[in-house]
C-alpha cells in the first residue's frame, strides 16, 4: 500500500463514524502498514469517550505482530498528546516504538502538539496537509480556532435568487426530494436548528426531523427573538411548541424574560444592534450548552447578517428550476448595504449535486 493509498484509507475509515456520536470530537481514522507495505491494523474513532482510532489500529496490529518498530502509522488527524476522556494516543505510539507517523491534518488545539513530542522520542513524523482530511473536520476546526459553533446556512431559492413571493409565500420553492435531503443530511446531523421568530410565525414551522419513512424526530431549536415576542399568548399554538421530551427551544433575547418560560425552553441574553443579533455575544454560551454545529434556516435579513459578521461557515444552496421575475419578491439576502467588489465575500465550491430538478451547491466560506 502506497502512502497516498494509506492516507486515503485512513480518511475513509474516519468517515465511517456517525458525527452525532463523536461530537465535539473530530473524525479520525488510522491505519498501520508494516515494513513490507502490508496493512496490519486499522481503526476509527466511533464514540465520544470511547477509544481513539490509533488505539483500535495498534490493538489490531499487535494481534499480528509484537514488534511495531518498523511499522508506519497513518492518521487522518494529528494524534492527541493530552489527557481528556481517554489517555494520549501519542504515548501509545511511543510505547510501541512505531517507526514513523504520517499525519494528514494537524490538530489546531494547542494542547495537542504531538509532533514535537514524537520527534523527541526518535519517531519520524511527516505532515502532508491533505485537503480532504482538512475538509472532513471543518466543524471541529471552527470550534477550536474560532471558539464558537460551526454554522451551516441553508438557502432555497428560485434561479433569480428569491426565497418567497411578494406576499411572503415560500411553500414550496424547492422539490420534495430537496426538502427530504435537508432532513436526512442537514437537520439530522446538527446539534440545533437556528431561526428567527418572524420565520416561525410566517412559515408555521415545527422544525422537526422527518425521515424518509415518515417518522418524526425532535430537534433543538434556537430562536432569535430580541423582545421575546414569540412568548405572547397569540403564538402559543404555533407548531414549534409541540410537546418535547429530549430537546429544547433556546430563545436569544436582549433582556431576561418577564414571565415564566414554557416547559423545555430556556433563554440566552445576547447583544443586538441595528442589524440584529451580534453572534459573538452568544458563542461561548452555545458551546457550553453543547451546540457545536448549527443549521440556520431563516429569512434574508438573518442570512445576510450572518455573512456580514463572518459567522457562516458553510452554505447549502438549493436552486429550483423557476423564476419569479418580481422585484417585490423576497430576496435570499437582505441587508441594505453598499458593498464594492473588492469587499465581496469569497466562497469555495465543495460539491454540486442534482436533486430531482433542483441544483444543490455546497460551499464553504473562505
What are these regions (language model features)?
Residues 36-134, 220, 307:
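Zn2+-dependent cytidine deaminase-like catalytic core
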Residues 34-35, 146, 364-366:
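Active-site beta-strand termini and strand-to-loop segments that position acidic
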Residues 3-25, 41, 85, 150, ...:
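Enzymes that bind and transform nitrogen-containing heteroaromatic metabolites
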Residues 72, 150-152:
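Structural preference for beta-strand elements that scaffold enzyme active sites
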Residues 22-38:
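N-terminal glycine-rich anion-binding loops that anchor highly charged ligand groups
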Residues 30-33, 155-159:
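Short conserved beta-strand segments at catalytic cores or DNA/RNA-binding microdomains
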Residues 138-148:
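Flexible, polar/acidic helix-loop-strand segments at domain edges
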Amino acid at each position: 500500500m502506497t502512502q497516498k493509498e494509506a492516507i486515503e484509507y485512513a480518511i475513509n475509515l474516519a468517515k465511517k463514524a456517525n458525527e452525532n456520536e463523536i461530537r465535539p470530537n473530530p473524525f479520525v481514522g488510522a491505519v498501520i502498514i508494516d515494513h513490507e507495505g502490508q496493512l496490519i491494523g486499522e481503526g476509527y474513532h466511533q464514540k465520544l469517550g470511547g477509544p481513539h482510532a490509533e488505539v483500535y489500529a495498534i490493538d489490531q496490529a499487535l494481534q499480528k505482530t509484537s514488534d511495531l518498530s518498523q511499522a508506519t502509522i497513518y492518521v487522518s488527524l494529528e494524534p492527541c498528546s493530552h489527557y481528556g476522556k481517554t489517555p494520549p494516543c501519542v504515548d501509545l505510539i511511543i510505547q510501541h516504538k512505531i517507526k514513523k507517523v504520517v499525519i494528514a491534518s494537524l490538530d489546531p488545539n494547542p494542547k495537542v502538539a504531538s509532533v514535537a513530542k514524537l520527534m523527541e522520542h526518535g519517531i519520524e513524523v511527516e505532515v502532508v496537509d491533505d485537503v480532504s482530511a482538512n475538509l472532513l473536520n471543518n466543524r471541529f476546526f471552527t470550534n477550536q480556532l474560532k471558539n464558537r459553533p460551526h454554522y451551516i446556512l441553508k438557502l432555497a431559492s428560485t434561479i433569480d435568487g428569491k426565497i418567497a413571493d411578494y406576499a411572503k409565500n415560500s411553500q414550496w420553492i424547492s422539490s420534495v426530494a430537496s426538502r427530504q435531503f435537508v432532513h436526512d443530511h442537514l437537520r439530522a446531523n446538527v446539534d440545533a436548528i437556528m431561526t428567527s421568530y418572524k420565520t416561525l410565525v410566517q412559515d408555521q414551522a415545527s422544525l422537526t426531523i422527518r425521515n424518509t419513512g415518515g417518522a418524526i424526530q425532535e430537534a433543538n431549536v434556537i430562536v432569535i427573538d430580541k423582545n421575546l415576542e414569540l412568548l405572547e399568548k397569540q403564538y402559543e399554538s404555533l407548531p414549534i411548541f409541540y410537546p418535547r421530551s429530549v430537546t429544547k427551544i433556546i430563545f436569544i433575547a436582549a433582556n431576561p424574560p418577564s414571565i415564566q418560560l414554557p416547559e423545555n425552553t430556556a433563554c440566552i441574553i445576547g447583544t443586538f444592534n441595528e442589524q440584529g443579533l451580534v453572534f459573538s455575544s452568544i458563542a461561548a454560551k452555545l458551546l457550553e450548552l453543547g451546540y457545536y454545529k448549527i443549521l440556520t434556516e431563516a429569512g434574508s435579513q438573518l442570512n445576510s447578517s450572518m455573512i456580514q459578521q463572518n459567522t457562516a461557515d458553510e452554505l447549502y444552496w438549493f436552486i429550483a428550476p423557476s423564476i419569479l421575475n418580481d422585484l417585490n419578491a423576497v430576496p435570499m439576502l437582505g441587508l441594505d448595504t453598499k458593498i464594492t467588489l473588492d469587499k465581496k465575500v469569497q466562497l469555495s465550491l465543495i460539491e454540486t449535486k442534482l436533486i430531482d430538478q433542483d441544483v444543490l451547491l455546497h460551499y464553504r466560506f473562505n
